[in-house]
């Protein structure tokens, strides 16, 4: 046969070249794809494959035996029980060499066992023969001794009977010899029978041990048998034992089986442990072997704690957390108590608390983000457009009445400041101004202390902060706060020193004061530009605009003009005719009329857009503030505004945010710490002022709520029962009536239905347009709830000149009033060497012999002190009264 290549052989065998090369390598032949293969190498490969693909290495045999057992019952009735015994044996094929070795070992073992058995039988025979011989010799000795005794006794008899006795003795001797021979024969037979039984027993034991060694040591075949018994009583278990012995050993019910069977009357004599052992023996053991050990629990306690990966969402109940850690809920509650938090098993806890508890208990925490839908919606946007320069967003900040809005009015050439209630700004105004050098967007923030959050929001949404400081007033508290907001937001500051036209203006003082807070002018080596302006005369306005544009040019402000818009809510309110209205500052992209927007918890389609002049616009680019209509509700000021593609997904995200906010809020409200519990217990009675607040815009609601809550003291607390944007409705009036609250309207009015409820319930309704007045009146209401302060006021002093004894009043002090007036029934103190030794009240006050109500300065009188007789000459009696002083909220 000619040699062929690997490729040709692979094509003939219909296999791949790589597999064929691997098969040759397994057979011990190294080949490559282009090598030739000889006939001998082919045969070697075929032998290798045949040997590899030989028959199965394991054979399993199963056997099932069924039997029926009749059990006698009460009343003469018998009960049939079906018994089924299942057995399974597995035979493992071995290698020929291993099989030969095991066969040789088995043959050697069998020979050794046979030799041991023969030696045991011979030894048993020898022992039995020696024993029989010893017993026969002893018997003969005893008989000889008895014969000798009888012969001696016979000699004493009468001589005439000697012949007869001799004959009888000879006959008796013959008979005894015959009996001795018979006894010897029986003893030999008994010894031989015992020897045979002993030999059989030893042989049986040796054979059984050999079989056990063969099945346990050689491991061929391996046997895995399991018995499944259906038992109903102790009789059934006994029958199962007998059936197992018949099936496994092939032996009948012999004497041993009968001996093993208990007697009928013995059923109750067995102890509980014996019955448990018998039951365990019936059911236990591989290969049908019975074990006498009692039942044992198979579970063992883990050697160390199991650390798990616990996945925690934004909120989770205590019970769910315990299930994730595979522990009891009580253990989680104990761990939370150690951390200082009280909770029940069904209470919702936030993610941070759950993480602390899980890590405290030694588990690894995986925080799960549940806002995949929100991320998917927010990431589905038009991106990739080139960034273009945009107009700067400038926030005007400063102290109240320093001229921020007036300065902006001059720039816009309008009269906005005169329209504000009280002449102070209470909203964020957003405007954009076209100048010769470009467009600028201005945000005008309030300067009053109550509007801290508005100023912070304005600083976050801005590029440049213009800090307005009055030259005649200098740095004030809100000026410092504006500097802090600007530094926190990381935006540059341009200082406008206003009211420079006033005679008392001092710009250098402003520079010195601002330098203490890190605002240094450029001429002093700092980074802030200082511009002197006058909002009234218009001086320095152009320089201020140039400084703003110069700062914007340094910042290189850019934004993507094309694509889907995003921005922030500057202000929001509820218009009675138009619905929810939000002032939005666009940051990037272009906002079109008809776009679908997602804004915090609200969503909707933009139905209309207006600029700050009230004119309709169709689109708004970066840095342009517009009012949008069409949202599902009033958004919170500061919320992100994003244009999305799908209104359905926007609705789902908004609803998800609402539900998640509610869950997180509930979890935080329920979190009760031990120290808070004890503080509430010791707090005692606290008066509350309940308020239902309605305002025109969201920012005002936020500012007023913060200001009112800060008024709370340890004795009087302010609770905002309800708040919202828009007019006062019937629902608000009903809520105020139910909670005994004050209705407060800030720049809003109550409708007709609400007024009817207010009149019927006699509710306290108050309207305000300036935040100063609102806060002052709430302070007055809280002051009326404060308990008055008690103050002791000394009204007179009397010096003891002499002491008299009275049978009715005891010791009477004769006194001279040295100061003020002494009144009867007023509390007094007795002073000795300027030390108070007694405090009580006057019982008797007399001038001469007449009782009087009061004695004035310079007059003598007799004073009887109630329940006190230790009055001495030289003591001073101090008379005082307690007056109430009404407290006020600071």
From Swiss-Prot:
Keyword Transport: no
Family matches, as PROSITE patterns: G_TR_2 (PS51722), IF2 (PS01176)
InterPro entries: DNA-bd_dom_put_sf, EF-G-like_DII, EFTu-like_2, IF2_assoc_dom_bac, IF2_II, IF2_N, P-loop_NTPase, Small_GTP-bd
A matching Pfam family: IF2_N
UniProt keywords, alphabetically: Acetylation, Cytoplasm, GTP-binding, Initiation factor, Nucleotide-binding, Protein biosynthesis
GO CC annotations on file: cytosol
Extent of Basic and acidic residues compositional bias: 92-217, 267-280
Major subcellular site: cytoplasm
Every tr-type G domain range: 389-558
Polar residues biased stretches: 67-81
Modified residues (N6-acetyllysine): 808
Span list, region G1: 398-405
Compartments it resides in: Cytoplasm
Protein family (similarity comment): Belongs to the TRAFAC class translation factor GTPase superfamily. Classic translation factor GTPase family. IF-2 subfamily.
UniProt name for this protein: Translation initiation factor IF-2
Organism: Escherichia fergusonii (strain ATCC 35469 / DSM 13698 / CCUG 18766 / IAM 14443 / JCM 21226 / LMG 7866 / NBRC 102419 / NCTC 12128 / CDC 0568-73)
